[in-house]
Amino acid sequence: VEGMGLKNTGGYIFYDGNNSQWLDPGKEKARDYLKSIITEATAKGFTEILLTDVSYPTAGKLDKIDLSNAQAVENADGDGRTANLAAFLREVRAVLPEGVTLSLELDADTIRSGAAVNTGGQALTELAPLVDRIYAPATAEETSALAEAVRAASDRCGFVPELTAAAEPLPESCLLVQ
């Protein structure tokens, strides 16, 4: 999408390791586009917005990404990527009608560490206070530890495990549809 995507250092569209393009959370036009979709969804009656892949790329030639829109803010701790993601979540929160739940999906490693482990800018400690719920693919065994990590980052943010990872092989009589 013209004027909204991540660029490489040569000024061309950045393709990650999966040959996918990414919107640049540092660009106002990209954030406005996503907020318009979210606003339309809530106008149609959706009561929860679950945002997935709210990060910068973590695969491909990461050193070739033009991160000029993700420079660390003066007098702020951490990475400008995290600051951009947090700013985006604050903007989304501002356009949501009263009573609409804002949720974010993170991976279990990010939740356990509390910080961006994959250089994508996701940091539980920065993002959890801005949303109502954190979702994560998890096994039943790791659910309580992940829930505790989310609570430690924000006492107002809930945790919802996506029990998609089987702790043990399913019996042959079970059918798993994904």
Which residues does each PLM region occupy?
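Soluble non-cytosolic domains of exported or imported proteins
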Residues: 24-32, 79-86, 144
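Active-site groove signature of glycoside hydrolases
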Residues: 25-26, 34-63
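Aromatic-lined carbohydrate-recognition surfaces of secreted/lumenal glycan-active proteins
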Residues: 50-53, 76-120, 155-167
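Substrate-binding cleft of secreted/luminal carbohydrate-active enzymes
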Residues: 125, 130-178
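Active-site-adjacent "subsite" loops/lids of carbohydrate-active enzymes
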Residues: 1-39
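Generic structural signal for well-ordered alpha-helices
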Residues: 38-39, 82-93, 121-124, 143-151
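Extracytoplasmic/secreted cell-surface and envelope-processing proteins
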Residues: 1, 58-61, 111-115, 143-146
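Aromatic- and acidic-residue-enriched segments that line the glycan-binding/catalytic groove
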Residues: 1-15, 57-73
